[in-house]
């Protein structure tokens, strides 16, 4: 095994976390069609190869029964696995060694703070207070979207504060299946788009705006293949009650309960 990758995924190693934070910090804040960043170099090449080689088996995923993801026969084109550290500990030893530092990084306060700093203006405009006072709860997931997956134009639900998605393709051949940003949800504005390149060790993030952050994913084909991504969504947790709600939902995963969102 490559020594660089071994050091990156060492249990308790801050390297993955710091690489994520640095990727956020060096990313340019773009304002069109809405505030967002496109991150590159999220992993060094050796670590990225190690991550893909340790992709969890399908038995650890469950169907996400979202309306846009369902086939006519009722099955889902989107497979989801939660990346909370306690869920990752169920994996076989080699997969666990690689994915546990990633899971911890996605749930880290330093990564949360990096996104808050980057999107300070938009978040403070929406919530009417300093970002330091905006409570959020991270929900990290690993996704394997099967051919036929699509999602229509939407801005994300009000319970979300920040949406983040990391792309995990094997190479650049899937470049054209990245998320599409729109200027509006319908009419001419919906046709004015910006697409995020679906490239190795890249990703995007944006602060959720109920009137601006319109995005979609075009339906994939058999030729496109499987679309593998990793997400962390920061849900609004501005009170002890809402924080407990997200924490309790996390606890219920231990008993096989899987929410639609």
Regions found by a protein language model. Give the residues of each.
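Hydrophobic residues positioned within well-ordered beta-strands of beta-sheet architectures
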Residues: 39, 138, 162-164, 230
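Signature of the catalytic double-stranded beta-helix
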Residues: 79-138
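Catalytic core of Fe(II)/2-oxoglutarate
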Residues: 2-3, 148, 155-161, 168-261
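Short, Φ-rich (hydrophobic/aromatic) sequence segments
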Residues: 1-12, 98-114, 163-167, 233
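Catalytic cores of PAPS-dependent sulfotransferases
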Residues: 28-33, 39-57, 107-122, 145-146, ...
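A contiguous catalytic/ligand-binding core that recognizes phosphate-bearing ligands
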Residues: 120-136, 141-162
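Active-site rim elements
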Residues: 37, 96-110, 150-151, 189-193, ...
């Amino acid at each position: 095994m490559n020594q660089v990758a071994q050091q990156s995924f060492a249990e308790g190693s801050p390297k993955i976390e710091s690489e994520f934070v640095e990727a956020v910090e060096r990313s340019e804040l773009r304002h069109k069609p809405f505030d967002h960043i496109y991150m590159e170099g999220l992993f060094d090449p050796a670590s990225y190869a190690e991550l893909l080689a340790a992709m969890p088996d399908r038995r650890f995923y469950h169907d996400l029964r979202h309306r846009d993801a369902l086939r006519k026969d009722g099955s889902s084109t989107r497979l989801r696995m939660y990346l909370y550290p306690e869920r990752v500990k169920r994996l076989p030893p080699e997969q666990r060694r690689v994915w546990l530092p990633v899971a911890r990084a996605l749930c880290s306060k330093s990564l949360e703070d990096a996104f808050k700093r980057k999107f300070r203006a938009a978040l403070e405009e929406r919530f009417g207070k300093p970002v330091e006072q905006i409570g959020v709860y991270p929900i990290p997931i690993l996704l394997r979207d099967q051919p036929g997956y699509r999602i229509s134009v939407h801005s994300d639900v009000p319970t979300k504060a920040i949406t983040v998605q990391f792309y995990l393709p094997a190479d650049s051949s899937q470049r054209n299946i990245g998320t599409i940003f729109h200027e509006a949800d319908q009419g001419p504005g919906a046709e004015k788009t910006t697409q995020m390149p679906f490239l190795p060790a890249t990703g995007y993030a944006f602060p959720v705006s109920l009137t601006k952050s319109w995005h979609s994913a075009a339906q994939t084909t058999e030729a496109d293949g499987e679309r593998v991504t990793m997400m962390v969504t920061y849900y609004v947790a501005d009170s002890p009650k809402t924080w407990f709600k997200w924490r309790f939902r996390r606890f219920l995963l231990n008993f096989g309960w899987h929410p639609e969102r």
